[in-house]
């Protein structure tokens, strides 16, 4: 892996972290879920439990896939910037702060284009009718991301599982 990084074999690398927290006070998973929903109203929040993996709570600004019958939607979310100072007033749905206050680097824009191109390529395997909008700046907590929206038709809903496997994980 290290040699591949040194030889620039990767176009993009995404690092993530897992946090395991211990509580000395009893707290129910339902209470944690409700608190996460309250703290992150614009995010997809999920509480999952399986015998094999235990209980997981996640909050993500990403929507893998949504829709019904033939009309579907997904997003490309890439580029991340922490909001600071006056930027914390940013709300993409209002004009309380100018969008020019959020300045995206060339690296972030390139990363967004990379992910959007990948999603377009995936969708075109299953649909002849793919429409892309964006990228736009969206907020998730104290962060902002670049997001492109994709609307498309899925003529064969029997291919839904294959499409999900193709889309996930995105680069």
Predicted ranges, named:
Residues 12, 71, 143:
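A residue-level signal for beta-strand positions that form part of recognition/binding surfaces
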Residues 17, 22-114:
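An anion-binding catalytic pocket shared by soluble metabolic enzymes
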Residues 11-17, 47-50, 134, 161-162:
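Short coil/turn segments at secondary-structure boundaries
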Residues 3, 21-22, 75-171:
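Contiguous alpha-helical scaffold segments within structured protein domains
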Residues 1-5, 36-40, 123:
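Hydrophobic, Leu/Ile/Phe/Ala-enriched alpha-helical segments that form helix-helix packing faces
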């Amino acid at each position: 892996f290290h040699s591949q990084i040194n030889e620039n074999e990767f176009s993009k690398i995404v690092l993530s972290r897992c946090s395991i927290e211990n509580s000395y006070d009893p707290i129910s998973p339902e209470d944690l879920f409700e608190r996460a929903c309250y703290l992150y109203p614009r995010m997809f929040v999920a509480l999952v439990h399986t015998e094999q993996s235990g209980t997981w709570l996640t909050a993500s600004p990403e929507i893998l896939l949504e829709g019904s019958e033939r009309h579907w939607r997904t997003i490309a979310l890439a580029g991340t910037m922490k909001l600071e100072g006056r930027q914390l007033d940013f709300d993409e749905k209002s004009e309380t702060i100018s969008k020019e206050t959020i300045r995206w680097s060339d690296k972030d824009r390139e990363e967004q284009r990379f992910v959007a191109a990948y999603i377009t390529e995936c969708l075109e395997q299953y649909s002849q009718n793919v429409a892309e909008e964006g990228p736009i700046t969206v907020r998730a907590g104290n962060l902002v991301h670049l997001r492109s929206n994709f609307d498309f038709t899925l003529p064969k809903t029997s291919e839904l599982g294959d499409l999900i496997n193709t889309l996930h994980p995105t680069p």
